[in-house]
C-alpha cells in the first residue's frame, strides 16, 4: 500500500540567517509557539557538524505557517533570521529608512543656478587694464550689494578707470591716439593696448587729484628719432 505524500507547499517554511550554534531543538522551540510542528531541521556542514545558516520547518497546518511568517524581524538564537514559505524563497531585505541613499534635497532656487551657487557669488565679467584685472560691477548693483567679496563701490571703479586712463601713457607712443596700433621705434614694433574710455570729466578730475603722485612719463626726443 502506497502512502500519499502530504502537500507541504503552504506549510513548509524556509529559515535563513541562523547562527552556527542553532540546533534542531532550538529551532523547534522557536516555532512551536505558532502551532504544531511536524518537522524542524537545521542544515549542517558534513565536516564540522555546525549549522550552515539555514533550515526548514514544516508546520502541521497552513494557518500556523502563516502566523510564523508574519513577524518581519524574527530573532532566533539571538540573531535576526529570514522566515518565509519555502516555495517563495527568502524574503528580500528591507532597507531601513535611515540608510536609504541619504541625499539631501536641494532648494529649487539653487538647482536653477549653475553649480548651485547663489547669484552674488558667481564671478562677473571683467575689464582688463594693462597689468590690472578689474571686475565689472554696475554702480547701482555695487552700491546695493552687501557681500564681503566686493569691497569697492561703483564710484571707486569709475575713479580708478579715469586715473588709469590718465596714467597709462606709453613711452613709445607720441600721443594716446597713436597707441591704438603699432608704433615703430628704432626698428622694433611694440603692440600697445588701447585704454578703455575715460569716465565723466568731473570724475576724471577727482581721480587725477587722488592719483596725482603718478605723473605721465615725458617723451624723450632722442628715443623717438
UniProtKB/Swiss-Prot annotation:
Chain ranges of the RRM domain: 11-88
PROSITE patterns cross-referenced by the UniProt entry: RRM
Gene Ontology process terms (BP): 3'-UTR-mediated mRNA destabilization; cell differentiation; DNA damage response; mRNA destabilization; mRNA processing; mRNA stabilization; negative regulation of cytoplasmic translation; positive regulation of 3'-UTR-mediated mRNA stabilization
Main location, first listed in the record: nucleus
Subcellular compartments: Nucleus; Cytoplasm
SUPFAM superfamilies named among the record's database cross-references: RNA-binding domain, RBD
Keyword RNA-binding: yes
Superkingdom of the organism of origin: Eukaryota
Pfam family, one: RRM_1
Repressor keyword on record: no
Gene Ontology MF: a single term: mRNA 3'-UTR AU-rich region binding
Keywords for this protein: Cytoplasm, Differentiation, mRNA processing, mRNA splicing, Nucleus, RNA-binding, Translation regulation
GO CC annotation: cytoplasm; cytosol; nucleus
Function summary: Multifunctional RNA-binding protein involved in the regulation of pre-mRNA splicing, mRNA stability and mRNA translation important for cell fate decision and differentiation. Plays a major role in pre-mRNA alternative splicing regulation. Mediates preferentially muscle-specific exon inclusion in numerous mRNAs important for striated cardiac and skeletal muscle cell differentiation. Binds to intronic splicing enhancer (ISE) composed of stretches of GU-rich motifs localized in flanking intron of exon that will be included by alternative splicing.
Entry remark concerning the domains of this protein: The RRM domain is necessary for mRNA stability and mRNA translation regulation.
Protein name: RNA-binding protein 24
Organism of derivation: Gallus gallus
